[in-house]
């Protein structure tokens, strides 16, 4: 048997394992799958049509509403769990978003909860929660999209602390979701699981690296799930599927025993946080994990903190920074329109004002460069080695990470220099913030995120310039949906006014999407950010904003 056939056979074994965990009555025939894939902008409605009205009522609800129904005994844990398992199975067969299926285990636990109902229900009792693949769950794989890590189920001792917390809170873990191999790409693809499509518009990528989460939640296959973010991996899929996604300050949600690429990298670290359809659910979840579980007791990297789950009242003389552009890449007309809507609302509200947030383009470039340099500091050796173990071919989306003919890995001294540059850049941004008069220093900043979606294979035609810098700065950032693209209103961008070749590429790609009409109706995603540790502030302001828009 050749190496080539061996890796392909192992891929098929993994796909067969996944497929075997879907009930026969939930499996779609090829004709139906093709029909749903071709109706690219109507997946939610089409999945609704395949589910019962009671299932749709459950899956289109919120955590808070389902909790109330459970408390009133209007719904059982089994009914809720079965509804989400069924819907997740249907969605997966169209967009390919699941890496591990635990339907049988979830339904057994739901039945146990119904038979052993406590007098006071734990905060997430009976609520199905989805997990990005890298979260370790006893009895199932954590592959990170690498074929060589499949068929190696985790033990009880390897289970992630956050998973243990979810169990303590009463949640029901029912699926893990797809990631790009290594998780170091914004497009969710692997040889093992294939390609994950956007559930709002199947013409586009789901984003990454928490693409499976974004696609599943976007189509109501889960109310809330956990993702991670080292360079937009929560915010990009959230933006692309019209969701709320929180990249917290480092040390908020425990990363203990969560598998990762580049483990041990402390400069520009990855963080773990929720993606959700409903902002109140997201805030409630964070308050449960932080206030009740107190992760700092067990995870030495977590910081004591109280998370505010409900306040939306803002203090007097509230200041909002509006970031219309970094001087390197111009945001598209849809983002400008959404930013202007937010700015006008703030300025019309008594006791609030908007100011322009305009850090220098030189600082923006440095922050972007630092993130990229950190990502390839080992010249891609870790990624390359993982692929070589199984013999699977390196994916095109990862070739920018593997410097075949480039420089050698950073020396210790070069890494120290990079770390120093990160600190200096963070301080320069703090200095810019302090340069505002005290009465005009922004409490939060509203910024573009992804600018536009991309078609499968077009990952490198978009930019992360409005995303990566907040990882370098360790600013909390909340992705928020603000309307949708209107091809007639938003229109084309002027490529003759491009600031540089990259800007011209972005403008040209935008024009292609507008002229094709594919992008019409696509969610517009912005992000609310604030200086380090102000996680409460970004959520509080977003709650206020959505009570007004």
UniProtKB/Swiss-Prot annotation:
Organism, scientific name: Saccharomyces cerevisiae (strain ATCC 204508 / S288c) (Baker's yeast)
Tagged with keyword Manganese: no
Pfam family, one: Amidase
PANTHER family assigned to the protein according to its UniProt record, in alphabetical order: AMIDASE-RELATED, AMIDASE-RELATED-RELATED
Enzymatic class: hydrolase
Similarity-based family: Belongs to the amidase family.
GO molecular function terms listed in the Swiss-Prot or TrEMBL record: amidase activity
Name of this chain's protein: Probable amidase
GO annotation (BP), single: amide catabolic process
Active site (catalytic residues): 132, 209, 233
The gene coding this protein: AMD2
